[in-house]
Amino acid sequence: MRSMKAIIEYLLKQALINLQQSGEMPIDLEIEIKVENAKDPAHGDYATNLALVLAKPCRQAPKVLAERLVAVIPADPSVEKIEIAGAGFINFFMRSTARSLIISEILNKGKEFGQGNLGQSQKVLIEFVSANPTGPLHVGHGRGAAFGATLGNVLKAAGYDVTLEYYVNDAGRQMNILAVSVWLRYLELAGEPIAFPANGYKGQYVYEIAQEMWSEQGNQFVHPWISVVDNLPADEPEGGDKETYIDAIIARAQSLLGKDGFANFHQHALKTVLDDIKDDLQAFGVRFDSWFSEQSLFEDGSIGKGIQALKDRGHTYEREGALWFRATDFGDEKDRVLVRANGQTTYFASDVAYHWNKYDRGFDRVIDIFGADHHGYVTRIKTAVKALGHDESALDVILVQFAILYRGGDRVQMSTRSGSFVTLRELREEVGNDAARYFYVARKPEQHMDFDLDLAKSESSDNPVYYIQYAHARICSVLRQLKERGLKWDKDMGLKNLDLLEQQHEATLISLIARYPEVIQSAAASCEPHQLAYYLRELANGLHSYYNAIQLLCEQEQLRCARLCLLESVRQVLNNGLAILGVSAPESM
């Protein structure tokens, strides 16, 4: 069944064709027809500014165009009347029977209501979170996790074939810093008088991993501290450079431990942290289809294949012993190094190989979700994709601003390297998964987010997730009261008497639930899950107003059954929408 908005868009398109065929409008017009929900019931159910958009290319007054369009709009049983308002807006009033049909559709489709075919089974890969496996996820990662998972659910509901992927950065410098941090804490447990590097990872989890290594391996990897720091450059507290020092101590650890010994610390730290990340995300309701290892790009030759693909297309050159990508040819501010003069590939080379691999796996569309601190990566990734011969429009890069926590009006500080961060797990334990999942997606991803912990825990109408869940629970309580009072809900009787739903609150609710499929399609088309969060709050508000104003379990059986059909439809839509957001729909609160 087509949505009412889709019906109106079709009618307007036919009206345009009619005017073009009669010579009253240019044939070569390329106009996007936009239909909006009317903000005021007095202006109908839907409205369009099509006549105003056509005024300039057609060189006619908007109101005259509106009159001509309305005159040739085909008749449709769903439409009661059409009016022209203001400078040329066209307002559509739908028949109550058309609105009521949506109730029958919802009750028949249940959990499948709202699912569409916008995506036409296109294969989409969404990569998100992808935090370095160097420590627990913090609350900033949580926003990206909630956004990516919800976007995946929205796209699935809109008919896309979605794969969710976490890119594991297990081959870079940060992992070496973690490995050496664990080793140094291991030496400390052995009684060595270490001085911990300014640039090392200092969290409690580093101690815990070191303790595991000490318990399992004993002292076989112990070396005297003096041999570790002999002839090393000064660290930052002694006036040196912390980056130079940490690189030097990594090299010393690799030399003393050997390849296998250092790999032992590297792999143990990686597995421990990655297992913790997986458990954390699983508990948050975020489930990935694929955990893609950066190291695998080296092992399966993807790094070389990605670089060779750029070479074959003539997009590389050599300078001072290094291999460069001609990024400026594709709009980047400067060319990028792929292979350094020492033969080491760069992070950018891994990015090229990873995206080459994504398209090589047959995905029609790729969505990268990065933290806002990665804004510098956007252009270089897009230039690489374009240089590899792929349509730039098949890549979407979405930047998600980190969340800022507030407790009691005061900002909560966090810092990963210092170990004093607030973890995602701590946030979930404090406010619950439901509040975290909703609050994280309630705003556009590019907008800064102030996460009010006190509000997220409050049981009031000011807390949007509580307000929405309470609407669902209220409907369930009505159904329980029905049984307690010995009354029956005859669904067939209710569906036959939907014309009895004459109250304005009922008309508002019916219009709201009819919009649900449109919200899903719009949220999917624009990659904006917050549209669904806003919509559910609006629907909950409509339900609460209805609940407070109307006697739902009235004596008149036909009306009571019709109202129960409406209530169950609202409950189903709330349930479906909350499921997409990753939020539970409690039956009692």
Curated annotation (Swiss-Prot):
Span(s) of short sequence motif 'HIGH' region: 131-141
One of the protein's GO biological processes: arginyl-tRNA aminoacylation
Localisation per UniProt entry: Cytoplasm
One of the record's GO cellular component terms: cytoplasm
Catalytic activity: tRNA(Arg) + L-arginine + ATP = L-arginyl-tRNA(Arg) + AMP + diphosphate
Keyword vocabulary terms for this entry: Aminoacyl-tRNA synthetase, ATP-binding, Cytoplasm, Ligase, Nucleotide-binding, Protein biosynthesis
EC id: 6.1.1.19
MF annotations from Gene Ontology: arginine-tRNA ligase activity; ATP binding
Pfam (any one): tRNA-synt_1d
Listed InterPro entries: aa-tRNA-synth_I_CS (IPR001412), Arg-tRNA-ligase (IPR001278), Arg-tRNA-synth_N (IPR005148), Arg-tRNA-synth_N_sf (IPR036695), ArgRS_core (IPR035684), DALR_anticod-bd (IPR008909), Rossmann-like_a/b/a_fold (IPR014729), tRNAsynth_Ia_anticodon-bd (IPR009080)
HAMAP family xref list: Arg_tRNA_synth
Family named by the database record: Belongs to the class-I aminoacyl-tRNA synthetase family.
Quaternary structure and partners: Monomer.
Protein name from the UniProt record: Arginine--tRNA ligase
